């Protein structure tokens, strides 16, 4: 079967939910028996988001093969239940880097290198590569940004050309826009959508479907107006209303026959999507009977998207126990030894996620101490594991000034030190220990019980690691190293035996959690928090 290509663009404003729309369509097509892959094109000039501030970009999502990518890839993986790779997130920086390397090699035979055709050809190659390497029936490509952005123009030109390259029956364009509701006038306005589509058509792209984000139901006469002015069928104007849960969106789109419209346009002969299991999930999510309050102690809590996968993994674990998750976002800069009890009052569990830099470090350490001393269930991730080790060294072993060499290079007790292979690394971007690595679990530990396995594979993103010079004396005081690299050299999981639930991992377990298959450490953490 010829691979089909679907392009999802956005207009009017950003953050309309293009990623959720693309992921939801991917789930519907997968449930129709199609093999689906999905990718995101980001128009920024950074090679990847690895060195960008979370306030600029949200979380960095890490794939199995170690790519640092856009957070939308997390949505893709969770919705479609597939593992993506480095080719699933393409930036302008990657495109230009590749074009310039080819120019230096002489691949263009002395020609003048231009946006058209050289840059656009490189973009098209990344689209087609996704289909070739996965042997997918359908490739869904989300174009980041909004129509009209100067940065997006080469990407839009490239996807325009693809229709001519492979034929109209093999390409589909879905455009996401906004229909604002003006409270003062008491009416909805279609003009922004009309102008956005006009802009898109001026670039040579006629959308086949328009997905309109709206707070209120769109009247039939407005759908007719949009269809008329934008030259599409009325049934191809799809409503994307705010949902109680993200996981309801595929069902809302299916109810409006989006997957049927796509299959008809692309001449896809496939079964109807069986969404029985998905409907059961949504029904469960909307009717949770329990409640658990988790404190997430971090320094980027003003932007929850910085911890998006962590929050979703907590919710997935909650679904398994019929419990809603109430996340208390605690700014670690506000936590002190004097107010930690007040800051964490009434929580059932404490989570310290990953991060970099020294801001808010002492507040996180105080939160960990409080969890350890008050026997409150605790889960640490990446930096959270490192700080749990430092807290124990300071307050149980009495190693004054114990710290991480990342935060204090002159510490007398570098509990956390640079990985040996990192000592000569100068570049910051793309040089961390990234991606999927094995971890050997110790029998009789909380970690081994959670996974019910001997060797596990989890995704990593770090440059510093536990210093083995302190392993023996910390073990003597009850600090357990329950997971290590297969050769025993790198510490992967630590835990406390005399605590109801205290465990921390160097890896990022949140990246592999799924709504119907919660990650084991999160599952056990929520179960312990419910018991508290």
Swiss-Prot record:
GO terms for cellular component: cytosol. Its EC number is 6.3.4.2. It catalyses: UTP + L-glutamine + ATP + H2O = CTP + L-glutamate + ADP + phosphate + 2 H(+); L-glutamine + H2O = L-glutamate + NH4(+); UTP + NH4(+) + ATP = CTP + ADP + phosphate + 2 H(+). The active site is at 382 (nucleophile), 508, 510. Residues 293-532 form the Glutamine amidotransferase type-1 domain. It comes from the Bacteria. PROSITE patterns: GATASE_TYPE_1 (PS51273). InterPro entries: Class_I_gatase-like, CTP_synthase, CTP_synthase_N, GATASE, GATase1_CTP_Synthase, P-loop_NTPase. L-glutamine binds at residues 55, 355, 383-386, 406, 463. Pathway: Pyrimidine metabolism; CTP biosynthesis via de novo pathway; CTP from UDP: step 2/2. Residues 1-268 are annotated as: Amidoligase domain. One of its GO terms (biological process) is 'de novo' CTP biosynthetic process. UTP binds at residues 14, 189-194, 225. CTP binds at residues 14, 149-151, 189-194, 225. One of its GO terms (molecular function) is metal ion binding. Disulfide bonds: none annotated. Gene3D superfamilies: 3.40.50.880, P-loop containing nucleotide triphosphate hydrolases. Allosterically activated by GTP, when glutamine is the substrate; GTP has no effect on the reaction when ammonia is the substrate. The allosteric effector GTP functions by stabilizing the protein conformation that binds the tetrahedral intermediate(s) formed during glutamine hydrolysis. Inhibited by the product CTP, via allosteric rather than competitive inhibition. ATP binds at residues 15-20, 72, 241-243. Homotetramer. NCBIfam families: PRK05380.1, PyrG. Belongs to the CTP synthase family. Catalyzes the ATP-dependent amination of UTP to CTP with either L-glutamine or ammonia as the source of nitrogen. Regulates intracellular CTP levels through interactions with the four ribonucleotide triphosphates. CTPSs have evolved a hybrid strategy for distinguishing between UTP and CTP. The overlapping regions of the product feedback inhibitory and substrate sites recognize a common feature in both compounds, the triphosphate moiety. To differentiate isosteric substrate and product pyrimidine rings, an additional pocket far from the expected kinase/ligase catalytic site, specifically recognizes the cytosine and ribose portions of the product inhibitor. This is CTP synthase. The lineage of its organism: Bacteria, Bacillati, Bacillota, Bacilli, Bacillales.
